[in-house]
């Protein structure tokens, strides 16, 4: 059946800021307490969506979550009217207010793991929201994520949206940032590839400096609940040394699409065995794996982390060629820029490189791949997505005007204490639900 990969990008929320909340994420820590520009951040992401849609790629939009999260702050013991809750948190525990105000749901690669209907046991598209239990500011996202996905992908004949896995370290799940899929064609059965940082119940290497956020047990549980064919499911461990170098998700060191794996030579433990397994498994499904392995001598792990070369989107054009979507930081790193020039000039599957300014997101450790959730849909499934979330000229104009109207152009950490920020955000989100036609999505609307 004809199918296409759609990318659903997260709209950056009005409270986008740099609070340095993500230990293990080098960019997040390096830019802690800098002033952010939410308006620029949202428009940078929106422009990427529009340009990719103009190039013929299926591009959807996911709305921000409500922030600050008054639910979290009240759960943590702050009481009173909304303004009082914010004031008390700002005075007594500003770090908790920062966690409650994070716009991190913009990185929808962590929203969920998605398996297309061609791979699942019941022939439906399956979504498992990620519990993101390693970080407080992200662990509060999964309920709203499930509500959003259930709203957009509402038809039970086509879609199954699960609850997140139990939020315990043994089942730490970071979503599609540690998952990719290989196939001959999007609509045919493929090979699902899960990458984990550690195993809770199996002895093996682990990072020493930064935490491994994804467990083998979580990856296996997602595969099982999606009803995947065990013979078409491959698990791999990310090299703990690269986690300690700042590769907190696999999509910072590797990206795959169709029959191509673009990866750094230090990405995986026992890499050759992984390549061999993927090759054999994909061969049984009618495709030959192309591994583009970037050597350390050309691009170091540090270069990869600072430029986010691998936190890129690898997209298939109608003619079968592929394009790599990278942040502009890749052009500012001499080693990475030289490698990309050589890559595009070669005879491999990647024939073109598109560069985007995503500076605001990048300063928090999120490149093009972080901002999107891949969802393979056949024609009937796409038709079942009835909300106004597909990017086109009209939606772009509406969202651009909405951002211009509602977003601040400067937000420093101290500004999170401003109670009017909550009112501004709710006003903006209320209007957004009308633009996207998603109904009463937020708690404050219910």
Curated annotation (Swiss-Prot):
InterPro entries: AstB_sf, SuccinylArg_d-Hdrlase_AstB. It catalyses: N(2)-succinyl-L-arginine + 2 H2O + 2 H(+) = N(2)-succinyl-L-ornithine + 2 NH4(+) + CO2. SUPFAM superfamilies: Pentein. GO terms for biological process: arginine catabolic process to glutamate; arginine catabolic process to succinate. Pathway: Amino-acid degradation; L-arginine degradation via AST pathway; L-glutamate and succinate from L-arginine: step 2/5. Its EC number is 3.5.3.23. It is an enzyme of class 3 (hydrolase). Keywords: Arginine metabolism, Hydrolase. Substrate binds at residues 19-28, 110, 137-138, 213, 251, 364. Belongs to the succinylarginine dihydrolase family. This is N-succinylarginine dihydrolase. It comes from Burkholderia ambifaria (strain MC40-6).
